[in-house]
Amino acid sequence: MSECGVDEERSLGGAFCAREGRRKRMRVMVTHAMLSYREVISAALEILRPHVETFTVEPENLDREFMSLSPQLVVCSRVTDIVERGALGWIELYPEQASESVVSLCGEWTIYPDMDLDTLLSVLDETRRLYEIT
């Protein structure tokens, strides 16, 4: 386990590419149940944060793709146990169509009554900062 309580077996937090001697790019996985949210968020991240690898995944493939891609941040409509234990950060965006979102960074939860793109980007930036110091 890392300082943040992240299962390092499942996370790339702090991982270096031994052959190349450099840090791997941070990965974000977007897997919201609403297709429009999934596509718009992924497109926005690719434009506004081009230094981050963004993967768009069908919700039913969340756990399998999480294990395969090892993203540091997951944006989803329902967090799973695997994501909760393995991701450095996650955003449960409007779970069950609620008006609020839940964010976890290093296991500390925060509820946001109104998640907007700026807030999502600030969570991504904080996750990246944590990724770089672990």
Q: Residue locations for each model-derived region?
A:
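Hydrophobic beta-strand segments of well-ordered beta-sheets in folded domains
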Residues: 24-29, 70-75, 88-94, 109
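Compact, well-ordered interaction domains used in eukaryotic information-processing assemblies
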Residues: 49, 68-82
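Short loop/helix-cap segments at secondary-structure boundaries that form the rim of catalytic
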Residues: 66-68, 81-88, 100-105
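Ser/Thr/Gly-rich flexible loops in soluble cytosolic domains mediating phosphotransfer, phosphorylation
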Residues: 90-134
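Acidic, metal-coordinating helix/loop segments flanking the phosphotransfer/catalytic sites
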Residues: 57-73
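Short N-terminal or domain-adjacent regulatory/targeting segments
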Residues: 1-21, 96, 115, 119
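Short, charged N-terminal beta->alpha structural module
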Residues: 20-60
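Short, polar loop motifs at secondary-structure junctions
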Residues: 59-61, 76-81, 94-99
